[in-house]
């Protein structure tokens, strides 16, 4: 049966540009999305994977003050660091950009104008939280207090994680600023609010059709509709995107809410990718074609913005609420096919926190261990469905027992014996039941693991693949090719056993490619194959040019340069299918594939790592 090519948009949460990435960040948004995108490309699908650094909002202003630099200098610094972190991890973005671009400003303003013209942006006087010491607006998430509904402590100004209800900062009992602990002042201020109640029926109908979502995501999203209210989409702040309304766009003291603009980034990045690759309308394939599937990857703390705010923006822009309206110039834009949310990766039971010293930075981790051990750990032991605690002991155990003793051992001893005894892929003779059994298991796992990957069940899929690795090692132990090699009368049998093992190594390497792309490239070459098997992302320096221009004051410098992540992933050979091991193909002598770690590392971690409690 011929499989039809699909268009797949992979939208990845935008990391906030106030510091380098730690492993908790990439466990939630980074590795799962890349495994999914690489798998979809291997299936022959047309994939667009986009993201970028989120660079607006009060937290960036606060951090810039701490470091004694301008907010743009701070954004530039951490944008580059994050780009380097994610490239080093092998995250295969078609475009990883940033929110301080002329293109992003213009696309965000177009979405706001469409919502405003259709009547879904309503102007109201609200109570805004202000820091008494700085006079700056305090973001909802930077205010904590007691929930007025369930009375749980630690509720944020946007929602209570304990009961799931949406809140306003002024609702909290005994609110305090997370930045400096002071009690905020609440002052009257005029803002534009997204009229969520006018979009509630459309949101509800759409969400109730998402029965294939992860149960926790769907339940949380439906619960948000029980107390839906208009939500402010502008802020009293001088750093952000101008509000494209006459009388507002030249007011440098009011800007669009950072979360209104951040979620539009998936669209603006797609538009930027299209014109940077020479086909300015190519983005429409992923946004206007209703047959396209779109997947959004993030941590669980961002579900609200992806299952309520962003869909509401898209519905309102298309005039699909109780107020009606016209479809904007960008056309009717696709709603998310699935919101794929991960739980939290913790350390010693605590959330990763740079300020509290509970942090393992991606850069340090990569320098010590390389990318694939971290990618493997996140895939097999990460927070896919539950909060997961990272310990050095568990990391060392997984690397040594599963990657080194399991996968690395299978590759090295299989290829070493074949190289030593034949120098090439040997010619098999008649297969025994044992030979056929392991070959059939590997072949069937393409289907079963592939089905799990289609559903973003990354743990299930890699567990199945590593089961084949274990069975292949057991097959070799049972067949004892080292003994066959000593008996000249068993040379045909030796050739058959090693050909069988090589075929299973090839199959497992193919299936592990989305998880371990760097290792997969090495195995590909060891098996005597040439060319790019698993393509790597590249850092490209670009200028802030844009065919779309924003309006207002405080706009990005059109000549500003910055790094983006791109890649030629069409050049890779990897396909999600068995590649026959052709007898006579020269083999290369294998180098150790996975370095075993000192068991003592499991007790203390590296010298640079925080002490485990």
UniProtKB/Swiss-Prot annotation:
One of its GO terms (molecular function) is ATP binding. GO terms for biological process: methionyl-tRNA aminoacylation. Binds 1 zinc ion per subunit. It is found in: Cytoplasm. The keyword Lipid biosynthesis does not apply. Disulfide bonds: none annotated. Its EC number is 6.1.1.10. A motif ('KMSKS' region) lies at residues 351-355. A motif ('HIGH' region) lies at residues 15-25. GO terms for cellular component: cytosol. Belongs to the class-I aminoacyl-tRNA synthetase family. MetG type 1 subfamily. PANTHER family: METHIONINE--TRNA LIGASE, METHIONINE--TRNA LIGASE, CYTOPLASMIC. Monomer. Is required not only for elongation of protein synthesis but also for the initiation of all mRNA translation through initiator tRNA(fMet) aminoacylation. This is Methionine--tRNA ligase. It comes from Corynebacterium efficiens (strain DSM 44549 / YS-314 / AJ 12310 / JCM 11189 / NBRC 100395). The lineage of its organism: Bacteria, Bacillati, Actinomycetota, Actinomycetes, Mycobacteriales.
């Amino acid at each position: 049966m011929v499989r039809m090519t699909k268009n797949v948009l992979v939208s990845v949460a935008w990391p906030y540009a106030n510091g380098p990435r730690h492993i908790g960040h990439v466990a939630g948004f980074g590795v799962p999305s890349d495994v999914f995108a690489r798998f979809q490309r291997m299936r022959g699908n047309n994939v667009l994977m986009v993201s970028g650094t989120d660079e607006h909002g009060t937290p960036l202003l606060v951090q810039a003050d701490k470091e004694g630099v301008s907010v743009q200098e701070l954004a530039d610094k951490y944008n580059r660091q994050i780009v380097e972190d994610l490239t080093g991890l092998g995250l295969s973005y078609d475009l990883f950009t940033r929110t301080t671009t002329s293109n992003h400003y213009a696309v965000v303003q177009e979405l706001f104008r469409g919502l405003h013209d259709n009547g879904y942006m309503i102007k109201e006087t609200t109570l805004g939280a202000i820091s008494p010491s700085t006079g700056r607006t305090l973001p909802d998430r930077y205010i904590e207090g007691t929930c007025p509904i369930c009375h749980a402590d630690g509720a944020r100004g946007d929602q209570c994680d304990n009961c799931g209800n949406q809140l306003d900062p002024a609702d909290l009992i005994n609110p305090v600023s997370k930045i400096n602990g002071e009690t905020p002042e609440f002052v009257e201020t005029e803002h534009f609010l997204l009229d969520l109640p006018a979009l509630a029926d459309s949101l509800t109908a759409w969400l109730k059709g998402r029965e294939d979502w992860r149960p926790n995501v769907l339940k949380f999203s439906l619960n948000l509709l029980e107390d839906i209210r208009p939500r402010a989409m502008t802020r009293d702040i001088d750093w952000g995107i101008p509000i494209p309304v006459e009388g507002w766009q030249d007011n440098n003291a009011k800007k669009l809410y950072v979360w209104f603009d951040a979620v539009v980034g998936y669209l603006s990045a797609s538009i930027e990718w299209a014109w940077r690759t020479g086909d300015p309308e190519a983005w429409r394939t992923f946004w206007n074609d209703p047959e396209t599937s779109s997947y959004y990857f993030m941590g669980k703390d961002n579900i609200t913005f992806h299952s309520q705010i962003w869909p509401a923006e898209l519905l309102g822009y298309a005039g699909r609420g109780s107020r009606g309206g016209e479809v904007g110039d960008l056309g009717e834009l696709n709603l998310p096919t699935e919101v794929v949310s991960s739980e939290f990766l913790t350390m010693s039971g605590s959330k990763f926190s740079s300020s509290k010293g509970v942090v393992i930075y991606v850069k340090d981790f990569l320098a010590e261990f390389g990318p694939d051990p971290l990618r493997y750990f996140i895939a097999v032991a990460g927070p896919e469905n539950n909060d997961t605690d990272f310990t050095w002991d568990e990391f060392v155990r997984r690397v040594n027992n599963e990657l080194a003793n399991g996968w690395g051992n299978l590759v090295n001893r299989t290829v070493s014996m074949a190289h030593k005894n034949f120098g090439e892929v040997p010619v098999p003779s008649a297969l025994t039941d044992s030979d056929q059994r392991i070959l059939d298991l590997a072949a069937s796992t393409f289907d079963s693991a592939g089905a799990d990957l289609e559903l973003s069940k990354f743990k299930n899929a890699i567990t199945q693949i590593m089961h084949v690795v274990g069975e292949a090692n057991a097959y070799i132990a049972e067949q004892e090719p080292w003994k066959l090699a000593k008996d000249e009368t068993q040379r045909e049998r030796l050739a058959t056993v090693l050909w069988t093992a090589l075929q299973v190594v090839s199959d497992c390497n193919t299936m592990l490619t989305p998880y371990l792309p760097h290792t997969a490239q090495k195995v590909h070459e060891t098996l005597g194959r040439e060319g790019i098997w698993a393509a790597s992302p590249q850092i490209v320096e670009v200028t802030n040019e844009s065919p779309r221009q924003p309006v207002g004051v405080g706009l990005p410098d059109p000549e500003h340069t910055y790094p983006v992540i791109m890649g030629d992933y069409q050049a890779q050979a990897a396909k999600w299918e068995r590649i026959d091991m052709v007898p006579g193909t020269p083999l290369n002598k294998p180098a150790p594939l996975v370095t075993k770690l000192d068991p003592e590392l499991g007790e203390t971690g590296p010298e640079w790592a925080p002490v485990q409690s």
